[in-house]
Every structure is written in structure tokens, then in C-alpha cells.
């Protein structure tokens, strides 16, 4: 039987918008990969997508049981868009060190909030 660890997060889109407007490229480069930035910045309103990816990274880190910090950094968790569901890319060392076989992620947003739920399969 395969074990699963879950993580969830919710964030106000306005909070991410304010952080991006205040810190601009420095904040984007600290949190988001180049591919994530390219995807979000193509959109008319990028803030909900940035917030959903931020929540996704938090949810993944919680599911991994590490949080963001020493074991895994913001940009180690890359969330890319695919037709069926978001794809989570992690460094191979993370899978090996934590004994994770796969990470599944669901992200969503409303007008005010972005939310995410991650499942890490062991």
C-alpha cells in the first residue's frame, strides 16, 4: 500500500500583488522560475496565477514535510501548466532524499484567494 502526505495552502491574491509591485523583479526571481514567470507574465492579469503558484509551492513543501528552507528552496519547486493538471518539477535529489515517488498538485483561484493542495506519494 502506497503512503501519501498532503499539504495545503491559501493566500490572498492582493498580498502577492503588493509584494510583486513593491519588490518587482527581485521578488519574482527569488520565488518563481523563469518558466513560471514567462507563463504568468503572458496573462492579462498575472497576479492570480502567481498567487496560485505561490500557494502550490507552499502546499508541496508541506506535503514533503520540509517547508521552504534548508532542504528545498522556492525555485526548487517548479509548477508548470499542462492540459490536465499542473505539473510539479523537483530536483532528483529531493525524490531520493525524501523517498518520494511522485507529487500531485491542484491549484485554483477566485477573485480574492488562491489555493492549492498537494499530495506526495511515498
UniProtKB/Swiss-Prot annotation:
GO terms of molecular function: holo-[acyl-carrier-protein] synthase activity; magnesium ion binding
Main enzyme class: transferase
GO CC entries: cytoplasm
Enzyme Commission (EC) number: 2.7.8.7
Pfam families cross-referenced by the UniProt entry: ACPS (PF01648)
Positions with a binding annotation for Mg(2+): 9, 58
Chief location: cytoplasm
Entry's family note: Belongs to the P-Pant transferase superfamily. AcpS family.
Function field: Transfers the 4'-phosphopantetheine moiety from coenzyme A to a Ser of acyl-carrier-protein.
NCBIfam families reported for this sequence: acpS, pantethn_trn
The protein, known as: Holo-[acyl-carrier-protein] synthase
Organism: Chlamydia felis (strain Fe/C-56)
Amino acid at each position: 500500500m502506497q503512503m501519501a502526505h498532503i499539504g495545503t495552502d491559501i493566500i490572498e491574491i492582493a498580498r502577492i500583488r503588493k509584494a510583486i509591485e513593491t519588490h518587482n523583479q527581485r521578488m519574482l526571481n527569488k520565488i518563481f522560475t523563469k518558466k513560471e514567470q514567462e507563463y504568468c507574465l503572458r496573462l492579462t492579469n498575472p497576479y492570480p496565477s502567481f498567487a496560485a503558484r505561490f500557494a502550490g509551492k507552499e502546499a508541496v513543501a508541506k506535503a514533503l514535510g520540509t517547508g521552504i528552507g534548508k532542504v528545498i528552496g522556492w525555485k526548487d519547486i517548479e509548477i508548470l501548466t499542462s492540459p490536465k493538471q499542473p505539473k510539479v518539477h523537483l530536483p532528483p535529489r529531493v525524490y531520493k532524499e525524501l523517498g518520494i515517488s511522485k507529487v500531485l498538485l491542484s491549484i485554483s483561484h477566485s477573485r480574492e484567494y488562491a489555493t492549492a493542495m498537494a499530495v506526495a506519494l511515498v
